[in-house]
Each structure stands twice: as structure tokens, then as C-alpha cells.
């Protein structure tokens, strides 16, 4: 199976490749951001995943969520996502949990938490889980109603601006007594379209955020070995 990852090994080096294969990545939210992050990590060589989502695949997801096709409409996202990743690398070990983030309960060790959910209560739960257990994390903030990839990047929650979701999360994190300065986030500096009545998007910006998350996780693990 290593022939699949010949080019990953060539770029990363065998030692780093073996390191990432040992890590357990928990992905909360398997939509436009989380789905792309998951697939990028799996194609890079990560093989241990915990997938958490309560939702089903809807036809409206197909314009931007890389994990799903027409045959997946109506399926639980966690099941469709697992099948997708196993079709790429059958050696992956994947635990699926059909639940909201705040209902997550697992004793399995986690090496990195990906927060790609929209629910603020869930975000606070995941942040508390990360801080209380010293688990590295990255949180996705608002990516809808935007067009530009060039302004998507990783920063700290207390350095964010121009993002209504970030403002709300920042306030609630402080109110909850959690540490705001150490919260890693992927954010778009683009001001969202004000004329949008709903959360609209194409694949471009959410997937850019997902790829940015995958890059951040890869670099963090290799740099801190």
C-alpha cells in the first residue's frame, strides 16, 4: 500500500511519513471545510481518524463538499465519508460517531482536533475538550458568502476581525473562562457579502480552508516531533 504514498514519502521523508501514520485526527463536521481537510490528510498519509457528524448528505451539499456524490444523498455523512476515505486507502482505521460535537464521548486518544462545525455551543465544547486535555486544535470560522482564497489563513482567535462568527465565538470563549489567546483558527479576512440572506458558497473558499487546516496539522506534527 505504500506505493500509493510514494510521492508523500519522497517529500516528507520516511521518518515524518511514519510519524503522521501514527497520529489520530478527530474531525468534527464533514462539510465543505472538514471534508476537504479529511481527504487531504488521508491522501497525504494520515490513516487514523475519528469522524463526528450528525447530519445526512443533502443534494445541496454536492456543489462544495468533496466527499459526496449523487449516490450518497440521504446517507449519514459519517458513513459516506468513511467509505470515501477507505476507497482511497483501505488501510485507514476510522471510527465514526453519529452525533453533534457536544455529545461526543470517546476514550480513544486524540492527537489533533479539527473543528469544522457551525454550532457555537459545539465549538465551545471542543475548545474545552482540547484545553482540558492538552490536545492541539484548529477551529474553522466563517467561510460562507465569500469568494477569495488568497485571504484564508491561520491565526489566533484574539487576532481575528471582520468575521461575525469569530466575534461571537471570541466573546463566548472569554465568558466561559477559556483561554482565547491560544485558540488556533482558520479565518478569511474577506468581509462576507452583506446582501446574502443565507449562507451561500461554492467549493472554492471552504475547500481552501480545509486545505489550510490539513497543511497546518501536517506542519504542526512534523515541527513538534
Feature roles, as predicted:
Residues 1-25:
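N-terminal charged helix/coil linker that caps or initiates catalytic domains
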Residues 43-48, 132:
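Conserved S-adenosyl-L-methionine
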Residues 46, 51-88:
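Glycine-rich phosphate-binding loop and adjoining beta1-alpha1-beta2 segment
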Residues 97-104:
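Conserved SAM/SAH-binding loop
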Residues 27-29, 52:
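Conserved N-terminal Rossmann-fold NAD(P)-binding element of oxidoreductases
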Residues 108-112, 117-125, 132-133, 137, ...:
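Glycine-rich phosphate/adenylate-binding loop
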Residues 33-34:
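Hydrophobic/small residue at the entry helix of a nucleotide-binding pocket
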